[in-house]
Every structure is written in structure tokens, then in C-alpha cells.
Amino acid sequence: MFVAGQVTIAGEVSVYESSEHGRRHFCPKCGTGLFYTSEAVFPGKIDVQSATLDNPDAFPLGAQIQTADRIGWMAGLADLPEFPRYPGME
């Protein structure tokens, strides 16, 4: 989460009203989700999708959110084998 006034957005952004209070902001050319806003849930902040940041490593994770709806097996992801890309394509 970032304070809305401290984030610079470059380029055109489209908005989809996904609920009464929620807004999903995305690239109008390719459809990539960029960030989510909800003045009712977290006023003055934006929930940026980490893969869209220029330098995501500069912002380490501080918490997990929406865990009430998490798929059961997601809690054990750290215990699974890891592959840089796809299995067998090292």
C-alpha cells in the first residue's frame, strides 16, 4: 500500500468499477492490472500490484492481506520446490 499522493503514474490508465467502492486501474492497451483503490476501505491509499513497480525489490513485503479468502494450500508455498522459469527449462 502506498499513499496516493506519493505515487507517480506514467501513461494512460483506465478504471473499472469492480464494486460499489472498489476501483481497478489497468493499462488500456494490454489490460495489465496496475493498482486498486477504495476510499471506503483504505482512504488516500493505493494498492499497487508489485510486478508493475520499476524496482519491486525496493519495497519488501510487510504483511499478507485477504488471508480470510486464501486457498488452503497457499500457506505452504514456501515449502514447495522452486524453478527460475518452468520445470525442466533451467
Located regions from the model:
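A short Gly-Trp-Pro
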Residues: 1-90
